[in-house]
A protein has these predicted regions:
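Enriched for short, Lys/Arg-rich terminal
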Residues: 1-24, 39, 55-59, 64-86
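Detector for the c-type heme attachment site
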Residues: 27
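A short, surface-exposed loop/turn module that caps and links secondary-structure elements
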Residues: 30-54
Length: 86
């Protein structure tokens, strides 16, 4: 069972600002999330419903999961020190 991945505009904007090596690392992680969005190491964010955090090196991926539609919405991508301020 594979999930469809979609991106919010701000996530795409942040991805475009990152170095190519970081983007490759993040996209590899997102690809693995499409097969299992609840894999080991994933944490649910407190205070949000169905919003999770994945690590990709020093970067964080915040995403929502809709199991009914098999959809993962990438909400925010960024450096770990900045991503939670958005």
């Amino acid at each position: 069972m594979s999930y469809t991945v979609q991106y919010e505009k701000r996530a795409l904007k942040e991805l475009s600002k990152l170095p190519a090596t970081a983007v490759r690392q993040i996209l590899t992680k997102i690809d693995s999330l499409s097969t299992d969005p609840y894999q080991t190491g994933i944490k649910k964010l407190k205070g949000f419903e169905n919003v999770f955090r994945a690590r990709a090196g020093n970067y964080r991926i915040l995403y929502e999961v809709n199991d009914g539609k098999l959809l993962i919405m990438i909400v925010v991508v960024g450096d770990r020190k900045d991503v939670y301020d958005q």
